Amino acid sequence: MGKGSSKGHTPREAKDNLKSTQLLSVIDAISEGPIEGPVDGLKSVLLNSTPVLDTEGNTNISGVTVVFRAGEQEQTPPEGFESSGSETVLGTEVKYDTPITRTITSANIDRLRFTFGVQALVETTSKGDRNPSEVRLLVQIQRNGGWVTEKDITIKGKTTSQYLASVVMGNLPPRPFNIRMRRMTPDSTTDQLQNKTLWSSYTEIIDVKQCYPNTALVGVQVDSEQFGSQQVSRNYHLRGRILQVPSNYNPQTRQYSGIWDGTFKPAYSNNMAWCLWDMLTHPRYGMGKRLGAADVDKWALYVIGQYCDQSVPDGFGGTEPRITCNAYLTTQRKAWDVLSDFCSAMRCMPVWNGQTLTFVQDRPSDKTWTYNRSNVVMPDDGAPFRYSFSALKDRHNAVEVNWIDPNNGWETATELVEDTQAIARYGRNVTKMDAFGCTSRGQAHRAGLWLIKTELLETQTVDFSVGAEGLRHVPGDVIEICDDDYAGISTGGRVLAVNSQTRTLTLDREITLPSSGTALISLVDGSGNPVSVEVQSVTDGVKVKVSRVPDGVAEYSVWELKLPTLRQRLFRCVSIRENDDGTYAITAVQHVPEKEAIVDNGAHFDGEQSGTVNGVTPPAVQHLTAEVTADSGEYQVLARWDTPKVVKGVSFLLRLTVTADDGSERLVSTARTTETTYRFTQLALGNYRLTVRAVNAWGQQGDPASVSFRIAAPAAPSRIELTPGYFQITATPHLAVYDPTVQFEFWFSEKQIADIRQVETSTRYLGTALYWIAASINIKPGHDYYFYIRSVNTVGKSAFVEAVGRASDDAEGYLDFFKGKITESHLGKELLEKVELTEDNASRLEEFSKEWKDASDKWNAMWAVKIEQTKDGKHYVAGIGLSMEDTEEGKLSQFLVAANRIAFIDPANGNETPMFVAQGNQIFMNDVFLKRLTAPTITSGGNPPAFSLTPDGKLTAKNADISGSVNANSGTLSNVTIAENCTINGTLRAEKIVGDIVKAASAAFPRQRESSVDWPSGTRTVTVTDDHPFDRQIVVLPLTFRGSKRTVSGRTTYSMCYLKVLMNGAVIYDGAANEAVQVFSRIVDMPAGRGNVILTFTLTSTRHSADIPPYTFASDVQVMVIKKQALGISVV
């Protein structure tokens, strides 16, 4: 820390004695009610991630009151929460001259709570001591138009961090009314006194017992002192809403008994299907006002709910439900987005089938219909089935799944799911996803694996069109595609004839059977269901004998050939669109039934995760630091870190890298430790990066933490802040990038050092610290003093940086400074000490002299004369004294006078006029000769003063005669005459210029147009204003004009062009031109004071004939005005 430069002094710091003590009382609205409630009482209530009770039932946090309400329609108000408050956060600084005012408009409030405080409260003395301080605030309410002080508050003590307090006020005036916070202590103007005050918030309190119907809530009261300056966060482990579940369903065992009759019963369940049903049909928080229960397909959800409850391997050797929903819906979102989250987690999609909202799940199911070339629309190109494939970049083989881990404080965990074979073949292609409502690692793994297998296995999309048969399935149904072009053989068609007696079918196209294996043919029976029968023989390629003919097989029905070497091609319909011609366009994506078994049995985890907080889930590393030290020319780094909680069975991996010359990172060292500290030794200079992460015995890794540090000489200070004080200057260096290992060397000089290399030999070394207070009676106001500062650390030192500053120029402040010094001295105490006189109007004359040594062996001596008198109960004193004292600044001699008036009189030649008088905080002198004067404000005599200079640099003078140079950056001049030459190096901008300049104007003649021909015709007028005090000349620049000649069939015609020019109405030119060009120009004198000059230019043309327009030309009118006898040019 900083040190003084006069003598050795160790700064003292008083203890912080201001601590915020507030009772946190909060009601958290948890959910739309009713809900099941806490899982395990107070063990399920966590404050700042710490349960109120531990797993053994012992108290972790004392003094906590928790009240729970399930959210029934009729529930009792929570006890201890009889008032309801609405807090308005301000966080506004309150300054001395700027009270903060707010208006209260709420009509129903009963009380107001003001929360206010200080950001810090500490005073630093000139010796570096940090002491308590105080600040005063007023809380005021405007009553009957005037401000009334309700609370007068003084905050007294010391704190280096924010301190808040609060007051509550009742008896409020009628609404609306104004409230304000006012600071009575002047604002600090220096860093030595930190006492910024703030109005943190105000709370409008209503004294009413509320029961909060249909709202599940938790009320918590806790003393915030247990949490220091931290914000108290609340988390609750709860079972959620009481849902409507099927009447034959047991949510605890997840068993369905008998046949469901379609009725419901209330129960808690985390089955995602019934959570979705609740959201869609609930009239308050869900979509029940737009969708009735009859508009949602509960039978489809019943099947999906059973699918979600089926047990699958959990990856640890046990089983768990396939899909559960443990989620909080905490923000308002679009209904479709929430619906999509639910459906994607259940591997289904919502479909409106025209009557109800139903759901189609991506799971194995029977095919609904078969399509081949015979029952689809055949396009002109002969390819009815059009295929598209997903891009390779969209086929991910690794996915990072974010899910909520109950064993890690319900924090977000990431499960990495990979397909190693696909990675080896295509390279790693990673994506990320959030598993909605997932609190199971196995479910998160299945969600990621489902995404990978869907993208890798189901890569095809088919589009085709059908007739009325397009209505045989709906979106979501599985269909089969038998495409002869894709298979390379005939795989489907129509049955032309059926002979049930001979079991022979006549097909519409030839088929070929394999040499081995059993071939099957699929036919449609009378119920519309596909039936497969064995093919026994084929005659003539189209007559097929089968093992049996299903009942109801009709002519022109569809057949499909199944061969042992031909895989069945299944697709799931995703859309059906009606075309303009009455056909239907179908889009379907590839369906692989085996995907479900691959996914549900694909999770295999090593080890078993514990269900306790002190399990083996590796925690995150936090608060990582690296401290560099030197040892015999070599450098060491001590790394320290901690974790949010103590976790058994974990160690820490450390990885240290250094930045190479090419910018890449080179590995220096790795280490593993079970401690939270580690020391690296024998490190070279360079820029390092250290990464630490926790790892458990099974190789699972927690979130890492990294810190960068530098083993090198420090950078020089980027800037130096110099703060003036009374006979002192505080120097505070700043680095461009904060480095806690860096301190600063301070060197001091009263003169500037021309060569920075001579700092150590030509200046005085002050010391090494983070800042320095250079304090001495020799540091005078109005003089420049120079600091030379460089950064130092264990590796080396930076270059010096120069800073120049001055002591304070606050004269009034110096008087207060001296007042403290004088009253603390022995002589000052003797002169100002009051003696109790026994009678009124009594007086006392005393002369005294003393000489002594105190306990610190300091020598002191004084002599003084003092007169005291008491009159009308008031004490008066006059005195004069001399002293010599030993002080901390050294030997000090004083001459003090105590009097209302001090004067010096020269009585020579009978003169009685004093040459110097001091009275009433003013000094009067007739004639003063000074070598140097420092005065923030200078004012001359007169009313108003003829001359003044203010501290902000504003100079005011009625008349100034400056014989030297004037340098100015900005300003305004009025009615100024420049007697001689003026040079302008920059840009000159003038609204109006009168003088030796040239003005010009130009314009083209108007034009007439006929068909595609246009020609000049019309008048232009130029007006020259008589606004100059000297003679000028008007110059008409050459104006050219001409007509044209035309010869057709030996006959010649002319189009003539005529120009007439007038000056003030008199013709000065009248000319005509055929095909030969004519030119007009003129110079006209314009004497000053004769009035304006008006020039009129008129141009006309003649036609070649009645039906042939003129072909004429004229240049622009151009006029210049110049001074008649211009400077800088002459003709001899």
Swiss-Prot record:
Listed Pfam families: FNIII-A_GpJ (PF24801), Ig_GpJ_C (PF12421), Ig_J (PF24421), Ig_J_second (PF24489), Phage-tail_3 (PF13550), Phage_Tail_Tip (PF09327)
Cellular compartments annotated: Virion; Host cytoplasm
Region of interest (Interaction with host LamB), ranges: 883-1132
GO cellular component entries: host cell cytoplasm; virus tail
GO biological process: entry receptor-mediated virion attachment to host cell; receptor-mediated virion attachment to host cell; symbiont genome ejection through host cell envelope, long flexible tail mechanism; viral tail assembly; virion attachment to host cell
Gene3D superfamilies the record matches: Immunoglobulins
SMART domains with a match to the protein in the record: FN3
TM stretches of this protein: none
CDD domains xrefs: FN3
PROSITE patterns: FN3 (PS50853)
UniProt keyword terms in alphabetical order: Host cytoplasm, Host-virus interaction, Late protein, Repeat, Viral attachment to host cell, Viral attachment to host entry receptor, Viral genome ejection through host cell envelope, Viral long flexible tail ejection system, Viral penetration into host cytoplasm, Viral release from host cell, Viral tail assembly, Viral tail protein, Virion, Virus entry into host cell
Domain Fibronectin type-III: 618-711, 712-807
Described function: Attaches the virion to the host receptor LamB, inducing viral DNA ejection. During tail assembly, initiates distal tail tip assembly by interacting with gpI, gpL and gpK. During virus entry to host cell, binds strongly to host LamB in an irreversible attachment. The binding induces structural changes in the tail leading to viral DNA injection through LamB trimeric pore.
Entry similarity comment: Belongs to the Caudoviricetes tip attachment protein J family.
Subunit structure: Interacts with host LamB.
Designated name of the protein: Tip attachment protein J
Species lineage: Viruses, Duplodnaviria, Heunggongvirae, Uroviricota, Caudoviricetes
Gene that encodes it: J
